[in-house]
Amino acid sequence: MQPQVKTGCQPREIHAENSVSPLTRLSGVITQFSSDTALLLIDVQKGVDVLEHWGGPTGRRNNPDAESHMLRLLAAFRQHGLTVAYTRHDSREAVSPLKFSLPTGAQKEGFEVQPTDICVEKDVNSGFVGTDLEIQLRRKGIKRLVIVGFFTNMCVETTTRMAGNLGFDTYLVPDCCATTNRIGLDGADYDAELVHDMTVANLHGEFCTAITPGDVTALLDADAPQLDRVQGNE
């Protein structure tokens, strides 16, 4: 009897546990952030403030308090002895302000990388592509990520999507992120707040659970029965 030859993509087997929407099945109380949780800061570099590069002649950003919120979370994670991880961007683009060879490639004040931190250097949007970020996180037993940084719709979004796809329990803190206006193909100038809000709406409930800075600091000390974990796409 000739063995059966299978060609092309085979359908995924559907089990009873998969008969419920992932969003429904996996939602629930968010438990306390502990040693399995890392704060991941994306590209907190001086070059993000060169607004005309990112948003054109009318360049402007949203959320001017993002850095102060990030600093408070950073201090809280360090105080609790939890893992801190950074991505730093060294652009392939000659005109980008995010190049290590330029002063604008340096970290913003207060976000200096410490010897005990995880830090990866990247030249694409995702912190997981071309780096050993996932390996370093897994080695430390990290299963949950709290993601903050720049820009909401670029490297933050790409890294958050990949984190969710890689199986991390992923939390995005929109108040600790920011972006700039974007110029569309037709020349339309899309406001930074609109770009930011739409990005968060796309990510929340699919690739991550979006929470506030206050939620994060509270979760460092206790479970949060009032919050729902709504990450799908798992």
Locations of regions flagged by a protein language model:
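Acidic-leg catalytic submotif of subtilisin-like serine proteases
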Residues: 38-48
